[in-house]
Design a protein with these regions (language model features):
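Beta-strand->loop->alpha-helix junctions that form or flank phosphate-binding loops
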Residues: 1-21, 116-122, 202-212
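Residues that mark the start of a beta-strand
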Residues: 87-89, 114, 239
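Short glycine-/small-residue-rich Rossmann-like dinucleotide-binding loops
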Residues: 95, 140-142
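Short helix-loop-beta junction
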Residues: 102-117
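Short acidic/histidine-rich motifs immediately flanking catalytic phosphotransfer sites
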Residues: 129-137
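Cysteine-nucleophile active-site neighborhood
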Residues: 142-227
């Protein structure tokens, strides 16, 4: 037995052999203090303090946001698509430095799609290639090492190639097709707003306030959405990994954020 539930609802560490008992929150405060002091000197003092407070007060959070919840049956949604003979074709779009394409292909394969590897060079060589696909997903990673900014080098490669620009512009304008950008792919698409209908209020992605690359697990709650990708998933709380050096959104005003949500 490594632990028991307490009536007080506060996690405690008890070591009977040496008659030691302390709240976990107190021990975590001791454990996290040195990291906080180092971060305060190295990074942004405000973000360092914010993270420190979140850690030592984690036991006071609303429990709803600590436990992942599914408000839909995964098998119930995917079964009707997985059994189809003619699966929709999706392009797993990548560029030099992108590293999340294999996991993305596997995810879409499990969701009932027929996945195809597509590099930007393929579109440049054959602009008509995109006509074959029902959807396109721009994957995550570090295209061109993010030297020009997150996703910007990838976007510029498309912008400054007439054939690729026209091909993707046509694809984005087709109401019978869809595009998804994840991680670096999302940052890349935010730099192609000029050719994506309905993206006027999309944000820019700029450096994190901490001035550091942030890799964390967070919980997201899915609101009501018109997106087909979130169909029947309303109110679900899912754990996701965020890993960005430029993950802060920048918009003209708060109304732009609301208008950007589908």
């Amino acid at each position: 037995n490594i632990g028991n539930r307490t009536k007080k609802g506060k996690p405690l560490l008890n070591i009977t052999a040496c008659n030691y008992s302390e709240p976990i929150s107190k021990l975590r405060k001791y454990w996290s203090e040195l990291s906080y002091l180092i971060q305060s000197e190295r990074d942004n003092k405000k973000t360092a303090l914010s993270e420190y407070k979140a850690k030592i007060n984690s036991h006071q959070r609303n429990q709803e946001y600590l436990i992942p919840k599914l408000h839909y049956r995964v098998s119930g949604i995917s079964k009707r698509y997985l059994n189809k003979k003619n699966k929709p074709k999706i392009a797993i779009f990548r560029e030099q430095g992108v590293n999340g394409h294999k996991e993305m292909a596997n995810a879409f394969n499990l969701a009932g799609f027929d996945c195809y590897d597509l590099n930007t060079n393929d579109v440049i060589a054959n602009p008509e290639l995109l006509n074959e696909y029902h959807g396109l997903v721009a994957c995550g990673g570090f295209s061109y090492g993010d030297v020009l900014g997150a996703g910007r080098g990838w976007a510029n490669k498309i912008k400054y190639n007439h054939d690729a620009l026209n091909s993707l512009s046509k694809f984005f304008s087709d109401k019978n097709k869809f595009t998804l950008g994840v991680c670096n792919g999302c940052q890349m698409l935010s730099n192609l707003k000029s050719i994506i209908p309905g993206s006027e209020h999309w944000p820019k992605f700029i450096k994190n306030n901490s001035n550091q690359f942030e890799a964390r697990q967070v919980l997201v709650k899915i609101p009501k959405s018109n997106s087909m990708l979130f169909k029947d998933m309303h109110k679900s709380i899912l754990p996701i990994i965020v890993s960005h050096g430029e993950g802060k959104i920048s918009t003209k005003n708060n109304s732009s954020i609301k208008k950007a949500i589908m």
